[in-house]
């Protein structure tokens, strides 16, 4: 993983996750637990710093092997943790991947996710060379759908039974971004 990667639009910074981010990520997850439990299968009521450290331990290898690219989102000074975004579920044969994001509860409604999606999609297209990025949001997750629409993603339809989160099955809206749309 390249620790030198740092993308910014002047309002936020996204950069690869680091082990030293564990405390602030865990704090953000715990603050946002009520919302995260609905949409994040990895989140659970007892989420602790040990969970975060275990996850972070695997990020370097995932990045190095081209399996997943996880970023943290910070304010422009790099001092306040705002959320996370990732390119994952990569399909090399057809050259596309999933793009996911979350913003801690105290930072919602400030354009953080929209800005992060713009930055990470540029990375996905220009650096990684993907020809398509997909944003999949549960039908009930209106906030994620708004972000997809704000960045110009095209709504392609409803995928039935697309998400399973804590044994609940959700239909999801499929959005796509392609390089020309940005």
Q: What does each model-found stretch correspond to?
A:
Residues 43-44, 57-72:
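A short helix-loop-beta-strand connector motif used in the catalytic cores of GNAT acetyltransferases and
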Residues 37-58:
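Conserved GNAT-fold acetyl-CoA-binding loop/helix
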